[in-house]
């Protein structure tokens, strides 16, 4: 049997996936079944755009359900170590860029719960890979997509 990819995530991220799955199964799936039923009542299915759209939507919902069930089955919940001196998944990290002093704050989460617009970056991102395992006050080199790198200093690490 081949090894399944594990999905590291916070407890909060795991619970959000469970909620999303529940909504897909109890709300979205029944809604699309009803849309298909209504579209069928229009008659000829060969030229029924409502029916085609509802069937497409059903396919997307079923794919989402399978994807989320897979992630839940293979979730690796990262427990907070309580150590706010070392960066790990689940921690919120504040750092300043050296030498300009620009401050940035990110929570490092598993890829399944990453949301850069809300300050949650994937543990697989270059910046998170550079920070994980480092300590408060460490200076770290972070590679940039253009091949350059920046130097940052970790100024705060906190639990969620």
UniProtKB/Swiss-Prot annotation:
Keywords recorded for this protein, A-Z: Coiled coil, DNA-binding, Transcription, Transcription regulation
Top-level taxon: Bacteria
Keyword check for Coiled coil: yes
A Pfam family reported for this protein in Swiss-Prot or TrEMBL: GreA_GreB_N
Cited PANTHER family: TRANSCRIPTION ELONGATION FACTOR GREA (PTHR30437:SF4)
HAMAP family per record: GreA_GreB (MF_00105)
Family that this chain belongs to: Belongs to the GreA/GreB family.
Protein name: Transcription elongation factor GreA
Species this protein is from: Staphylococcus carnosus (strain TM300)
Lineage, broadest ranks: Bacteria, Bacillati, Bacillota, Bacilli, Bacillales
Encoding gene per record: greA
């Amino acid at each position: 049997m081949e090894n399944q990819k594990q999905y590291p995530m916070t407890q909060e991220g795991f619970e959000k996936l469970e909620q999303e799955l529940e909504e897909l199964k109890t709300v979205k799936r029944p809604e699309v079944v009803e849309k298909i039923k209504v579209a069928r009542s229009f008659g000829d299915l060969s030229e029924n755009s409502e029916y085609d759209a509802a069937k497409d939507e059903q396919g997307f919902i079923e794919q989402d359900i399978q994807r989320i069930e897979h992630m839940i089955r293979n979730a690796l919940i990262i427990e907070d170590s309580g150590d706010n001196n070392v960066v790990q998944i689940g921690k919120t990290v504040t750092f300043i860029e050296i030498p300009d002093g620009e401050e940035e704050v990110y929570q490092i989460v598993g890829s399944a719960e990453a949301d850069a617009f809300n300050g949650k970056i994937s543990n697989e991102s270059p910046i998170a890979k550079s920070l994980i395992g480092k300590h408060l006050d460490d200076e770290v080199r972070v590679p940039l997509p253009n091949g350059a790198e920046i130097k940052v200093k970790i100024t705060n690490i906190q639990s969620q």
